[in-house]
Design a protein with these regions (language model features):
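A short, N-terminal "cap"/entry segment at the start of jelly-roll beta-barrel domains
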Residues: 1-57, 103-108
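Short strand-connecting beta-turns/loops that link adjacent beta-strands
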Residues: 55-56, 78, 130
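Conserved double-stranded beta-helix
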Residues: 55-70
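His/acidic/aromatic-lined binding-pocket segments of jelly-roll/cupin-type domains
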Residues: 62-63, 74-75, 80-85, 114-115, ...
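Conserved metal-binding segment of the jelly-roll/cupin
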Residues: 66-68, 107-130, 137
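Glycine- and acidic-residue-biased ligand/ion/polar-headgroup-sensing regions
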Residues: 67, 77-97
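Extended, positively charged loop/linker patches that create polyanion-binding surfaces
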Residues: 78, 95-113
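Double-stranded beta-helix
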Residues: 98-101, 105, 124-153
Length: 153
């Protein structure tokens, strides 16, 4: 499976692939390949970034998750984030500063309606189905402080 990803992307971290260039064509089994990669990764997640590197001003990423998976509560202090579910289901929850849930919504690939999270809002996803794939859209560059995790969450 990785050989398919390596033909179109470079693995920059375990389970994180960046396309060789914008406009790259991907095979029809892309989602299956990413889901399989998520199953074998210790963090239960795999990413294919359509942007060739983290410095790009536009960041578009396919993210695949394998159950059981739950994000740590986090926020993006410098940018909003848009998620589009394309396969499976997950629960998207926003939180206050005390890690108390403020809102929660099921996002479903059968109804691929985008959900946006404003910059600075604590949030997380929890995968409900055996696998879940979404597209994440944000602005770059992606820096060390682009994602901040809530302490004790």
């Amino acid at each position: 499976m990785k050989s398919t990803l390596f033909s179109v992307a470079k693995e920059t971290l375990q389970g994180v692939f960046h396309a060789h260039n914008w406009g790259q064509e991907f095979s029809e089994d892309l989602l299956e390949t990413l889901i399989e990669e998520a199953r074998i990764n210790l963090n239960r997640k795999a990413r294919l970034c359509l942007h060739p590197n983290p410095n790009e001003p536009l960041q578009v990423t396919y993210l695949a998750f394998s159950s059981p998976y739950s994000d740590r509560i986090h926020k993006h202090p410098h940018r909003p984030e848009v998620l589009v579910p394309i396969f499976g289901q997950a629960k998207h929850t926003t939180f206050d500063n005390a890690a108390v849930a403020v809102s929660s919504k099921i996002i479903d690939g059968r109804l691929p309606i985008a959900i946006s999270t404003p910059k600075g809002v604590w949030h997380a996803i929890e995968v409900i189905t055996p696998s879940f794939v979404m597209i994440e859209i944000g602005t770059g560059p992606f820096l060390k402080d682009s994602t901040v995790f809530l302490q004790n969450s």
